[in-house]
Amino acid sequence: MAKIEAHRVPGFGAFIRSFGCFSVRRGESDREAVRTMRRIVADGHALGLFVEGTRQRSGVPGSVQPGAAMVAIQEGAPIVPVAILGTQTWSPRHPTPVSIAWGEPLALEGVPKGGKGYKEASAQIEHEIRRLWDWLVALHEQGRPDGVSLPADRR
């Protein structure tokens, strides 16, 4: 799932659609996107999305929007939290290292359906993403061990 504007970028839009990416209208209730999300999850497929709703240019995790929690709770699916560090400075012209940490799946069983439950689940997801992000920051502060090169250095 990607913002509708990403689908309009020449070349990129066709690329992301080629592997099943669909659009979402941000800042409003996009019922068609929610139906698509629910269908994908109900069919047993993985659904990738940025639960914050956008890339965080500040470099720190943002607030988790309730849509992912809502779909996970309604469909009985787990959420796999992911923290990404380094995208705030990355660009195609100036690529920089980006680190990704995957957490354990969060089962949201027992969390009630409805606004209060979705907020509670979103807070759990946000807490876990922040924990993973803090871990990535700590790893970066330690630096790379001697003798270990980045893949780009090996070309």
Question: What is each stretch, according to the model?
Answer:
Residues 1-29, 35-36:
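Catalytic core of membrane glycerolipid acyltransferases/transacylases, capturing the structured
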